[in-house]
Curated annotation (Swiss-Prot):
Domain named F-box: residues: 2-50
SMART domains tied to this protein: FBOX
Disulphide connectivity of cysteines: none
Organism: Arabidopsis thaliana (Mouse-ear cress)
Name of the protein: F-box protein At2g17036
Source species, domain of life: Eukaryota
Coiled-coil region(s): none
InterPro entries: F-box_dom, KIB1-4_b-propeller, SCF_F-box_domain
Amino acid sequence: MMDWATLPKDLLDLISKCLESSFDLIQFRSVCSSWRSAAGPKRLLWAHNLPFFPSDDKPFLSNVILRVAHQSILLIKPNEPQCEADLFGWIVKVWDNIYVSRKMTLLKPLSSSRNYFPQHLPRIFDMSKFTVRELCREVKLYHPDYYCVPGHTALELELGKTVVKYLNDDKFVLLTILEYGKLAVFRSWDREWTVINDYIPSRCQDLIMFDGRFFAIDYNGRTVVVDYSSFKLTLAANPLIGGGDKKFLIESCGEMFLVDIEFCLNEKPEFTGGFYSYFNETTVSYKFKFFKLVEREKRWVEVEDLGDKMFFLGDDSTFSASTADIIPRCVGTGSFVFFYTHEESLVVMDDRNLGVFDFRSGKTELVNKLPEYAKLFWPPPPWITTSHESVENYTGETSSQSQS
C-alpha cells in the first residue's frame, strides 16, 4: 500500500499550489506533518492599508484608509450523515481576520452583516470533522473605523462591490464601483486609485472577474471589458431592450449569465405567483429574466432553462452551484435563484429578506416560509450546535483548527 506521507516534497508543493481554496489547503496540510511542512499557508496580499478614493467634494476622506477583507462562502456538511436531515448542508460566509491568527467572523452568506448566532454555537470548529466546500471567494473594501469619522455619517463611507485579479504572488489589481456608479482601479504597484473616465451611459450595477478579465454592466445592460493596463473600456455586449431595474453578472459552468430583475409596484397584487412586500398600500413583486453572453455577437441571449442549478445573488459576489450538491434529490430538483429583496433604489421597502425564485414555476417566495430551503441558511444545523461545547455571550467570531 502506498505510504502517502513519503510523497516527494516538490510534488506536494506543486499540488498545494493548485489548491485555490484556503480551506482545501487547511485540509491538505492536516493530513500529516510531512504534508504540512511541504505546503505553507497561502500568502495574503492585502495585509496593508490602501488610500481612499480621490474625492474633490469630500476632502475629509483624504486621510481615510481602506483595507481589503477576504471572505469565503462555504457549504459545510458532516462527514458521516446520521439521518436524512444531515444531507442538507449549511451555507455560511466567513471573514478571515488576518490581524488575529486563525480567527474568523461568521456572516450572512449573501451580505456582509453579522448574524445573531445562538449562544451554544461553538467557538472552535475542528474542520477535520466536516466536509467543507468553498462555493465562492470574495473581497470587500472596508474602513477599520467605519463609524469613527467625526461629523460624518456611515453612508458617506459607503463602499461598492469589488473584484480582484491576482497577477502573481506580489501583484494584484482591484476594480470597484464608486459612488454614482463610476469605476476605479487599484494596481498594487501604483499604490493609488485611478478613476475610469471612459464613457459609461448609465451607472454601473455589477462587476465580475470572468475568463481572466474584468467585466462591468450598467443599468441598461451595456456590458464592457475593463482593461486595467490602459484603463479603457471595450464593448462586450450591447444594452438590453426593455431591461429591468437590477442586474447581476454570474459565472456558471464556464459561461457568463445575466440575471435581470424588474421591481413591480402595484396598489393591488396583479400576479398569481410570487410574494409581495407591503409598505402602506403598495405591493412589490419581482420579475426575472436570464441571459447568456455571446461575446462574439456582442449581445445577451435570453435563456429558457438553467438546468439543475442554483444561482446566489449577493451584495459582494454572485455564484452558482449544482442543485443536487446543495439539497438532497428527495427534496427536489430544478433551478433556483436566491436573492435579497431589499434594494436601495426601492424606497418602499424597509427591511431585507431573503427570497427564492423557482425558475420552472416562475414563482417567488420568502425563504423563511420554505423550511426545505431555510435550513440551508438558518438556524445552524443540529450537527453543528450539538457536537461542541456551548459558548455564552457568543458574538459571531470563531476559530478554525485542523488536526495534524
